[in-house]
């Protein structure tokens, strides 16, 4: 199930739910997606606030700034 974010980007609602649990939630979500590099949650004031990205560690600056 995909939804449109405020930025007009399709975001998996499960990723959004995991993000609400913080870094650990994203890492778990990414693990179950078969990605073992951890995860990160989009930070405030970025275009990807409230969703998980799975191509970086939980504390990687590029991940938090959504400069992927």
Curated annotation (Swiss-Prot):
Origin superkingdom: Eukaryota
MF terms (GO), sorted A to Z: lipid binding
GO cellular component entries: extracellular region; membrane; other organism cell membrane
Name of the protein described by the UniProt record: Defensin gallicin
Function: Shows antibacterial activity against numerous Gram-positive bacteria. It selectively inhibits peptidoglycan biosynthesis through complex formation with the cell wall precursor lipid II (1:1 molar ratio) thus inhibiting cell wall synthesis.
Keyword GTP-binding: no
Signal peptide bounds: 1-16
Main location group: secreted
Posttranslational mods: Contains 5 disulfide bonds.
Key words, A-Z: Antibiotic, Antimicrobial, Defensin, Disulfide bond, Immunity, Innate immunity, Lipid-binding, Membrane, Secreted, Signal, Target cell membrane, Target membrane
Tissue spec: Expressed in hemolymph, gills, digestive gland, foot, adductor muscles and mantle.
Species name: Mytilus galloprovincialis
Cellular localisation: Secreted; Target cell membrane
Sections of the chain in a coiled coil: none
GO BP annotations listed: defense response to bacterium; innate immune response
């Amino acid at each position: 199930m995909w939804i449109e974010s405020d930025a007009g980007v399709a975001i998996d609602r499960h990723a959004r739910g995991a993000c609400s649990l913080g870094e650990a939630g994203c890492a778990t979500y990414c693990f179950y997606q078969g990605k073992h590099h951890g995860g990160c949650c989009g930070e405030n004031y970025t275009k990807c606030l409230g969703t998980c990205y799975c191509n970086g560690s939980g504390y990687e600056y590029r991940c938090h700034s959504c400069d992927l």
